[in-house]
Each structure stands twice: as C-alpha cells, then as structure tokens.
Amino acid sequence: MTISFKGLARGVACAALVLAALPAAAKEFRLGLITPPPHTWTKAAEAFGAELSEKSGGAHSVSVFPARQLGNEAQMLQQLQTGALDMAFMTVAEVSNRVPNMGAFYAPYLAGDINHAAAILRSDTARGMLAVLPQEAGVVGVGFGSAGMRQILSRGAVNSAADLSGLKLRITPFDPILDFYNALGAAPTPMPLPAVYDALANGQVDAIDMDVELINVLKYHEHADTILISNHMMFPMVGLISARVYAGMSDADKAMISELMAKHVDSTLDVYMVKEPEWTDALTKVGKTFKRVDQSFFGDAIAQWETIWADKAPSLPELRKTAADLQ
C-alpha cells in the first residue's frame, strides 16, 4: 500500500483541526451537598451545572449529589482536599472547623435579619476572608450564599432563656454554635438533618436550632410546641472548588467556572431575602406557640461567646464594623 506525502499531510492537517476543536480539558465535575433535593442550595447547584454546560458548549457538566450522598460535610471537605471531589456548596460552619477565623460569621446578632446578612456576605470584608482557604483548607472559595437566619424550635414551652437550660438541643456540629448554646446552659447535640424529624418525634432531642425554610419544608413543627423567631445567627454557605482540581484548570476555565459558581451561590441570598418572610409567616398558621425575641432574650450568653471567639476569629472586629456600616 502506497501513501502519498500529500495525502498524509492532508490527513495530519484534518486530525489537527479536529483536535483543535475539542476542549482542552472537558470534564464532568462532581458537586456534593448535604441539603435535600428541594432545598434552595441544591436548586442553585443544579442551575450552576446547567449554565456551565451551556456556556462551555457542552464541554463541561456537573453531576450534583445532594442529601449527603457523598458523605457528611467533614468527609466531603476531606475529599475536596485530596481532589477526590471537585466541588461543593458547603456551610461555612464546616469550613470554620478547619479555619477558625471563619467562625466570625456566627457572632450572635452580627446581622439583624436576612437582608443585612446578605449585605455582609457580599461585602469586600467577607470576600477577603476567602483568600486563605487554599493554604489553610485546600479549597478555593468563590463566594458566599446563605441559608436562613437561625431560629429555635422546641417540644415544650420556652418563656425565657432559662427554659433552654438542660435541654438536648440539636445543632450543626461546629464550635461557634456549640459555644453559644453551652453559654445558655443547654445540652447542644450535633445531629445530621435526616435524623432530626424522628429525633423530635420520639423525644431524643427537646429542641432544635434551625432555619424557617427547613422547619416548613421538612415539617419539623409537627412535633414541636414553640417556635422562637430569634434570628440569633446568620448561616452562610460557601461555593468551594478543590484546590487540586482548580490548579489543573486552564485560566479560561478557572475564570468561567468561578464566575458562574459565584453567581449561583450568590443567587441563594436573593431567594432567602424574598422567601424568608413568607416562610416565617407560614409558621404563624401551623397552630403552634409563635414568639419573636431579640438579643436581650439571651442575657449574657452573647458576651460569653464574644470572649471565647475574640482570639479565635481575628477578623471579628472588622466584620462587626462592616456590619454596622451596612445597617
């Protein structure tokens, strides 16, 4: 068989054109969350994946794994660090377990309401706190979102903070909220979301720290007597990319993926600003005792928290100043 030089050259040229048309690093990314499929964060993750596929011409896609399918947040953060997981929408709570300065976001009454919380999370001060994540946690933070403000749901009556003393109270497992409830004399009990409904129903816990979205959507109020709207803490989320995975991206992909993820993470703030008043109003109609309280309700527990976290979270004074400026 004889192959002419011209024929070979044409074949090489055609192959080169085909290869040039292919993306340099087409990939299906895996993104993990702890939230269930109907949750705002999960919907934002799915929207991010859809837009990334569109903007990359189908080169990139995102498979979303909600509801702890890839493990709890501590496990997913470890997977991000090794590169076994590409991306996550994760509570800042879990990140603060590795980077204590992030605990500043959980200062009691740092934000007055969800609108104020959104403004704080969109500030230069907040975004600047992401810079250390590659070095300290092995992840790249692209921006903040949020869940709703924290409230308290109790199986029994709560007329004062003293009524929380000794109660087994479900929390997300991280130090800032643990310290807050310890200061109140409660018995904070870490527990994953899937276990909360049954734990309330059978009395395994007496109360829970939760936001109004999940109190509504997962119907936690069905096994409670008192809904305490306290807005005592914000509960931010951060969009994360494995630093190992990020390092292997082209500059163009780094820019596109970071921008799109930041956009959809940020969109959760807009959702909560609209929906949180609606979810709160819905809880006034479920036939439970409904109370609104402010920071005076918690007595000196807030000052105790500040004493503990003053050294752990050096960004706290600047973040409080930013919060005051944005009121």
Curated annotation (Swiss-Prot):
Keywords carried by this UniProt record: Periplasm, Signal, Transport
Q: List the subcellular locations.
A: Periplasm
| CDD domains the UniProt entry points to | PBP2_TRAP_Siap_TeaA_like
Q: What is its main location?
A: periplasm
Its transmembrane ranges are none
Binding-site residues for 3-hydroxybenzoate, renumbered to this chain: H39, T40, W41, R150, R170, I171, T172, D211
Under Gene Ontology molecular function, one entry of this record is:
carbohydrate binding
Q: Which GO terms describe its cellular component?
A: outer membrane-bounded periplasmic space
Matching entries from SUPFAM superfamilies are given as: Periplasmic binding protein-like II (SSF53850)
Q: A GO BP term, please?
A: transmembrane transport
Q: Which family does the record assign?
A: Belongs to the bacterial solute-binding protein 7 family.
As for what it does, the entry says: Solute-binding protein that binds 3,4-dihydroxybenzoate and 3-hydroxybenzoate (in vitro). Probably part of a tripartite ATP-independent periplasmic (TRAP) transport system that mediates solute transport into the cytoplasm.
User: What is the protein's quaternary organization?
Assistant: The complex is comprised of an extracytoplasmic solute-binding protein and a heteromeric permease formed by two transmembrane proteins.
The protein's name in its UniProt record: Solute-binding protein SPO1773
